[in-house]
């Protein structure tokens, strides 16, 4: 049913709020194992326990976090295209249909992040300020690259190796847009964790995904138009 005037605007806003919040809740439910381990990791104070929980998170990520996050990107991509969405069934369909590809992407990204994080804490322990900042910058670029990978996985139909190469081209082909995404993502994360924590279970994932997709689609479209 379509509504006109003020009622129509209210209906559109309410519909988007419902879609974003429900999609985020579904994503969180699928990530319950990761959330449980992360919660215990934050509470842990013994190095042995921290290492075990960190290893568990790394092991779970390719099998749980990456497939569910790519499914969330797929659903939000439908929002952007104004396609009709059956949230739960579509989410499950994307999760199941892209599971193997998502797992491969997740394995590659998880190994990279594990090496980066371990090296960062090693350098931090050494007290090398210059290298510490180098790793922080590398982490920032890795964050942007990872967000672009998620977006590319639902917009570009290609094998994983080719996908990773195309993402690098898109990212460095439009550095301002890409860096803006990184800064915006960090600002949004700070805002919702420090000031708007009550919105975290409803909008954190879905809004961040929405912003990532908008930037990626803009960058990808510009790149395609610039080709002869």
PLM feature segments, named:
Residues 136-146:
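Generic alpha-helical transmembrane segments
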